[in-house]
Amino acid sequence: MWQQYYTVTTLDEALQLLAQQREKARIVAGATDLIIELERGVRKGIDALIDITRLPDLDKITLDEAGGIHLGPLVTHNQCVASPLIQQRALPLAQACWEVGAPQIRNRATVAGNLITASPANDTITPLMALDAVVTLISVNGQRSVPLREFYTGVRRTVLQPDEMLIDIAFPALQPSERGMFIKLALRRAQAISVVDVAVIVDLDQTQTVKSARIALGSVAPTIVRATDAETYLTGQTLTPGVLEQAGVLAQNAAHPIDDVRAPSEYRLDMVRIVTMRALRAIVAGEERGLLPAQPILLAGVRPHPLPLSKSGEGSNRGDGVIQTTINEIEYTIPTGQDKTLLRFLREDAGLPGTKEGCAEGECGACTVFLDGAAVMSCMVPAPCAHHAQITTIEGLAVEGAPHRLQQAFVAEAAVQCGYCTPGFLMSGAKLLEECPHPNKAEIAQAITGNLCRCTGYYKILAAFEKASKE
């Protein structure tokens, strides 16, 4: 899929490579979108990937002295979901991150990547647009700051130049008088692209009069848009039922939806009104936290990010040498597979066929493995990420030669039919039990949102999870 894979050890090195390769190179962090685009042949002419995941301190969420929140380019969606700062001072962003994909995807996918992919249905763009975010772009020639509202030029198009990378996402933290909410309408409750999404933020005075309002809409125009007519109308108003109704109607003025396989334009337009009203009603009722759990299930383990290569005494890996990795506590040195996904590397080069390929696009979870402690979809991970990493596959799930307690529960409850999806369910479940030894039904459901079974109807699988959770 690529000819060269650079795992850089300094930011300067990444920028120099971008300057040299330009249109032929792409920055890799989570790679969850890019891998699929390369597999499908959507991205043409890309010869080199520049992996920045080993650079230190780019995965931080910080609050500066002026009250601004900063996200580094390696901050993942699950980091935002779990961050007390984001939950307390940027709740709509935490809610949007929770809606992205499944836990295995959120452990890899970055907020920066979601912004750069630039789909009008990408969840995190909408709240960041409402939060008045600014992105900082850097190259060998210097850096510049661009308001997120000016970052997009069309569907999947941005002002990012071929030699630039996004180095920072910044926005003002919400103040105590400000309340906000993100709502996503999709065809399923997980692993689904938005039909419509909305982020609403209102600043209320002591009389509950709106001092200012910000409303952003996703999946209803070529880019994420602000509902300026509704924002202007709400300013100075008290949030009565009639005001909420009119705000929903005015929000429709900003929407220019299309017909597609997920919904006709008329439905989308009507749902803009309804979802905007729902968000405003929840804010009025003090229920803006919505469905975001108090303790979200992450499947992230104890070390979700790889150690910098500099700690191993090694410089950049160009992807044309060997991959040295530890799989199931056994060290491997493998001279092949650098141009593959981790899934195919494990099956074809490491000789471990237990990890299955069900969809090769991050939908089914059959390929779930642990990479540096976190559950990931191995079909969406470049194989060179295994270099100096710790990997656990289904073959390594047994504890001291005895089946894992979830494996034993699957046998006891007859939770296997064709068995093709079983390795993925077991890996997700084992990480759940590590993170939450006695999960409830809702937590079990959260853990397997990224795993599909086409045989059992899930009842036996859920019974096995519940049995294991009681042991």
PLM features per residue range, with description:
Residues 358-363:
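Short, glycine-/polar-rich solvent-exposed loops and beta-turns at beta-strand/coil boundaries
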Residues 94, 245, 337-353, 380-471:
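Ferredoxin-type iron-sulfur electron-transfer modules in oxidoreductases and energy-metabolism complexes
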Residues 312-315:
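Glycine-biased, low-complexity coil/linker segments
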Residues 1-306, 317-326, 331, 350, ...:
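C-terminal structural segment of proteins
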Residues 330-338:
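Short, contiguous acidic and Ser/Thr-rich linear segments
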